[in-house]
Amino acid sequence: MRIVFAGTPEFAVPTLRALIASGHPPCAVYTQPDRPAGRGRKIAPSPVKQLAIEHGLPVFQPASLKGPEERERLVALEPDLMVVVAYGLILPTPVLTVPRFGCVNIHASLLPRWRGAAPIQRAILAGDRETGVTLMRIEPRLDAGPMLGKRSCSIGDDDTTASLHDRLAGLGAEMLIELLPGLAADRLTGEIQDESQVTYAEKIEKSEARLDWQKDATSLSRRVRAFNPWPVAETTLEGTVLRIWSAQVLDPAPDAPPGSIIACTKNLDVACGRGALRILEVQPPGKRRMSAKDFLNAHALAGKRLGT
């Protein structure tokens, strides 16, 4: 079976690697154009491109798939199937009709819950106890195609977007390889999504990272976990931004105004609208990440408040 793979970030790498390892190396790999990355903002290839080059796979990097020349190039590849994982570009209808068995996408949620750009973060923010991956046929509407398979996993109290991202990326790769024979035989029956159960995972905005200490400790803990590794939860201490990488809920808490530092000797505990948050790892401006204990050793915080 001739497979075209389309993906860009780290989330897509396990699936491409699994296709290669299973004896189904793609006849072509599509990925987004090289872009500035890292602290130096140097132009760098995507993680998918790096893996494709390592294995000698042809790589295409169009800025868009909307032009007729891109459809013609895809037609020339004579694909049986196009596998899409976090590609980042819209596949127009003329492209969707090219592969013999269509185009499929691995989405990082149990559809129809959390269609959209940020399903992992939104699942954590909502307090979901379970998430997973869905293999679906791609249709013009966003994440709305028939579902060909699902795999689920639990969301632990300590899970961050980073940890869940890696688990789901591996789960998606395993699912695709398991379902590949059915795709090749064109015998997978798609399950129509229940539109009454749809929720949308809006793109994460950097402004969401600022913690509001009036909120309860549980919701603030979810924000810390959801925004690790980006954009990273933050607060202010005497007008200076303090990033918070890790925290845990304490309950009950002393009666103190939200944002008040209620312990600052062995632990850094902060009063919330309900309950309290124990901050475990922070990052001051221009500094590395450090444990709250190391931060406390260098700062006198008794009687101070966060968010000021």
Swiss-Prot record:
Record field: catalytic activity: L-methionyl-tRNA(fMet) + (6R)-10-formyltetrahydrofolate = N-formyl-L-methionyl-tRNA(fMet) + (6S)-5,6,7,8-tetrahydrofolate + H(+)
InterPro entries to which the protein is assigned, alphabetical: Fmt (IPR005794), Formyl_trans_C (IPR005793), Formyl_trans_C_sf (IPR037022), Formyl_transf_N (IPR002376), Formyl_transf_N_sf (IPR036477), Formyl_transferase-like_C_sf (IPR011034), Met-tRNA-FMT_C (IPR044135), Met-tRNA-FMT_N (IPR041711)
EC number: 2.1.2.9
Cellular component, GO annotation: cytosol
Gene3D superfamilies: Formyl transferase, C-terminal domain, Formyl transferase, N-terminal domain
NCBIfam families: fmt
UniProt keyword annotation of Transferase present: yes
Protein name as catalogued: Methionyl-tRNA formyltransferase
Domain of life: Bacteria
Pfam family, one: Formyl_trans_C
Gene Ontology molecular functions: methionyl-tRNA formyltransferase activity
Binding residue positions for (6S)-5,6,7,8-tetrahydrofolate: 109-112
Organism: Methylococcus capsulatus (strain ATCC 33009 / NCIMB 11132 / Bath)
Protein purpose: Attaches a formyl group to the free amino group of methionyl-tRNA(fMet). The formyl group appears to play a dual role in the initiator identity of N-formylmethionyl-tRNA by promoting its recognition by IF2 and preventing the misappropriation of this tRNA by the elongation apparatus.
Family listed: Belongs to the Fmt family.
Disulfide bond sites: none
Keyword entries, A-Z: Protein biosynthesis, Transferase
Keyword Methyltransferase assigned: no
